[in-house]
Amino acid sequence: MISASTLDFRDALPDRGRLAGLDVGTRTIGVALCDAGWTIASPAETILRAKFSVDAAKLRALVAAQLVKGLVIGLPLNLDGSDSPRTQSVRAFARNVEPFGLPILLWDERWSTQAVTRTLLDADASRARRAELVDKLAAAYILQGAIDAMI
C-alpha cells in the first residue's frame, strides 16, 4: 500500500511499530529510524546508490534487522505542490519497494534538506561533515514530521 494520507498509513499500522524514513536522492538514500512508539526519529545511515537490486537488498536487510513495520518516503514536490521530475522518480522508487509488503507513506519533503543544512551550518559543521550527515538527517527530519502528524 502506497499512500499520501497519514490516516490511511496509520490505519495500516494498528499496533504501530518501528518506522524507517527515507530521503531518496540520485546518489544516496538517507535512512532514519524511529522507536516503536513513534516518539522520536533518529538518523541511521546513508546508502550509496547503485543498481536498484543492490539498493533493495540493503534496504531489505535493514528492514529485517530493525523490525521495521512501515516506510515513510520523502516526496520532493515543487514549491507550488506540483510534481517535478524527481517526484516521479521517487514515486517509481516507492512502487519498486512496494513488494517489501510494508505500508508506505509518501511525505512532503519540501525544505527538509535546506532545514538540515541550515542547522549544520549553525553548528559550524565543516563541508565534509555536512556532506556526510545531510542525507540521513534529512531522512530523520522527514520521518519526525510524519510521526508528529500521526500522533
UniProtKB/Swiss-Prot annotation:
Protein localization: Cytoplasm
Name assigned to this protein: Putative pre-16S rRNA nuclease
GO term, biological process aspect, one: rRNA 5'-end processing
Pfam families: RuvX
Organism the protein comes from: Rhizorhabdus wittichii (strain DSM 6014 / CCUG 31198 / JCM 15750 / NBRC 105917 / EY 4224 / RW1) (Sphingomonas wittichii)
Main location per the UniProt record: cytoplasm
EC number per UniProt: 3.1.-.-
Tagged with keyword Repeat: no
Function summary: Could be a nuclease involved in processing of the 5'-end of pre-16S rRNA.
Domain of life of the native organism: Bacteria
A cellular component term, taken from the record's GO annotations: cytosol
EC class (word): hydrolase
UniProtKB keywords: Cytoplasm, Hydrolase, Nuclease, Ribosome biogenesis
One GO MF term attached to the UniProt entry: nuclease activity
UniProt family annotation: Belongs to the YqgF nuclease family.
